[in-house]
Curated annotation (Swiss-Prot):
The gene is atpF. This is ATP synthase subunit b, chloroplastic. The lineage of its organism: Eukaryota, Rhodophyta, Florideophyceae, Rhodymeniophycidae, Gracilariales. Keywords: ATP synthesis, CF(0), Chloroplast, Hydrogen ion transport, Ion transport, Membrane, Plastid, Thylakoid, Transmembrane, Transmembrane helix, Transport. In plastids the F-type ATPase is also known as CF(1)CF(0). F-type ATPases have 2 components, F(1) - the catalytic core - and F(0) - the membrane proton channel. F(1) has five subunits: alpha(3), beta(3), gamma(1), delta(1), epsilon(1). F(0) has four main subunits: a(1), b(1), b'(1) and c(10-14). The alpha and beta chains form an alternating ring which encloses part of the gamma chain. F(1) is attached to F(0) by a central stalk formed by the gamma and epsilon chains, while a peripheral stalk is formed by the delta, b and b' chains. It is found in: Plastid, Chloroplast thylakoid membrane. Its main location: plastid. The keyword Repeat does not apply. F(1)F(0) ATP synthase produces ATP from ADP in the presence of a proton or sodium gradient. F-type ATPases consist of two structural domains, F(1) containing the extramembraneous catalytic core and F(0) containing the membrane proton channel, linked together by a central stalk and a peripheral stalk. During catalysis, ATP synthesis in the catalytic domain of F(1) is coupled via a rotary mechanism of the central stalk subunits to proton translocation. The keyword Transmembrane applies. One of its GO terms (molecular function) is proton-transporting ATP synthase activity, rotational mechanism. It comes from Gracilaria tenuistipitata var. liui. One of its GO terms (cellular component) is chloroplast thylakoid membrane. It is a single-pass membrane protein.
Length: 182
């Protein structure tokens, strides 16, 4: 930066008394135009090769990165598609399991209700049988008591009505009947 300032200060302080002016030199050989052109062409050729190879390498890297990205995108889309298929299958399996569970629960509930009804019917039958047995036993007890009371009553009436004469006749009658068997 300082050198640019020095150049400008030299040009500004240049003595104009010498009648020097800036002009275009038409002599190509003295002006080194050919050398400058050759230098520029050489630089362009070298830089073209250098920059061209760098740009080609860069372009190849970018294209390779794009291809890799596209390949990863294809793989990701493939995995996504496969995952969506698996999700759909899983949802179908879950729906089927839920349906089977509901069916099984309904069957179990119905089985429990049927078993409960059968148990109630058994209890009713057992209760009826128990009641019938109790009725028979009570009837037998009543009959025994009625019979016992009747025998006591008849015995009491007989004791009141049978005289010793009647008693002797009954005994003789029974002996006579037994005598025929002996």
């Amino acid at each position: 930066m300082d050198s640019c300032i020095q150049v400008f200060s030299v040009i500004a302080n240049f003595d104009t008394d010498y009648n020097l002016s800036i002009s275009f030199n038409t002599d190509f050989l003295e002006a080194n135009v050919i050398n400058i052109l050759l230098l520029l062409l050489g630089l362009m050729y070298v830089l073209k090769e250098f920059l061209g190879s760098i740009l080609v390498d860069r372009q190849e890297k970018v294209l390779l990165a794009i291809q890799e990205s596209e390949e990863r995108l294809k793989q990701a889309n493939s995995r996504l598609s496969e995952s969506e298929k698996q999700l759909a299958q899983t949802q179908m399996v879950i729906a089927q399991i839920i349906k089977e569970a509901e069916t099984t629960a309904q069957k179990v509930r119905q089985s429990i209700l049927d078993q409960g009804k059968a148990d109630v019917d058994k209890l009713i039958s057992a209760s009826k049988a128990s009641i019938a047995t109790a009725e028979v036993q009570i009837k037998q007890q009543i009959q025994l008591q009625v019979t016992s009371l009747a025998i006591k009553r008849v015995t009491m009436q007989l004791q009141d009505q049978i005289t010793p004469n009647i008693q002797t006749r009954i005994i003789d009658n029974n002996i006579a009947q037994l005598g025929g068997y002996l």
